[in-house]
């Protein structure tokens, strides 16, 4: 039996629109990433700790070729809500600075959605016309066996979809994280699509690769100005 919802009261369905469309396989929000002004990470970490009893679970200091960022991942007591805090690690027109200017202040940079079959989910996203971030170069996939020996994933399937793979295979135990990002969709805000196979991190191994790819995109768009001698 159909159970009435608040949407039945506050909204009217358009004619010819499926009221229960088939989704793309995503189940829950895995995490939200919060971009803050340089020097404000401690303020926001304290805010989440005092009001919601969050605690720090990860800290990253990512350096690109020209810019960098620091990231502190916070989690709720039950582990169900996770919010990494990002700030620019040095002055300049880095990715966080560009976001803050476009968003007119601090806010959520991206929303990560969890699936249990990222291959099928990405195929559905592409079929639906969802714009995804440019895939990494083929060298990324050729280096996977060196970085994650015996990871067990189909590398051709990963490359065909532009999926990133992270985690560990130490002691023959596979703890993997598969992820891909959309293009910006809500102003400067974008989405991350993720599948966890025993890994509860945030793709630290991919973090630097993603950061550098975004840095290259900034250079190509003319947002990040670099010295030609330094770029050579």
Please report, for each region that a protein language model flagged, where it lies by residue:
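Short, small-residue-biased leader/transition segments that mark boundaries at the very start
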Residues: 1-2
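N-terminal beta-strand motif that seeds the catalytic metal site of vicinal oxygen chelate
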Residues: 6-45, 104-113, 206-216, 220-232
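Contiguous mid-protein beta-loop-alpha structural module that forms a pocket-lining wall or clamp
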Residues: 21-26, 64, 85-87
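Short, structured motif recognition centered on aromatic/hydrophobic residues
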Residues: 29-33, 48, 54, 83-85, ...
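Core segments of cupin and vicinal oxygen chelate
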Residues: 36-82, 120-123, 127-130, 135-149, ...
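Active-site-adjacent "gating/activation" loops or surface patches in catalytic cores
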Residues: 78-96
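Active-site/pore-lining binding-face segments in mid-to-C-terminal subdomains
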Residues: 96, 102, 109-186
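Low-complexity, glycine/alanine/valine/leucine- and proline-rich hydrophobic stretches
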Residues: 186, 194-217
